[in-house]
Amino acid sequence: MGYRSDVAYTIRFVHDDDTNNKQSFYTFLAEAKANAATAACFNEEAKEWSEFVVDEAKHRINFHADHVKWYESYADVQCHEALLSLAKEWDEDEDNNSGIAYVFVRIGEDNDDIEEKSGGDWDYDWVNVERSISRDW
């Protein structure tokens, strides 16, 4: 069976100038699709076990998968990690005025296994962890 995780991330362009968002978004998409490490994220086969949406109207990429084996040795996981690394590179480039922001959250089966990464001017409501109690009554 293996260890399972729930995973979600979003990459967004949130510059005040919407024209800048559009240009940056499509430049980022072109770079990601041309890069061997990230291109597979955009293949239809990769979407069979997860939700991967390129939202052109809102200049964002959203990903969500429940109960998956999120092992760093898996090619599909490496692709998504590479896409997040590309977003981080864009965010950390001082000459880049793209307005990129991203948030990644992975929750493992163990209660203390939570991984979070973020960058840019992100909003807490995009992706976050909420604790709750389930009951059968």
Where are these regions (language model features)?
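Short, extreme N-terminal segment that most often corresponds to the first beta-strand
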Residues: 1-31
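Charged interaction segments
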Residues: 30-137
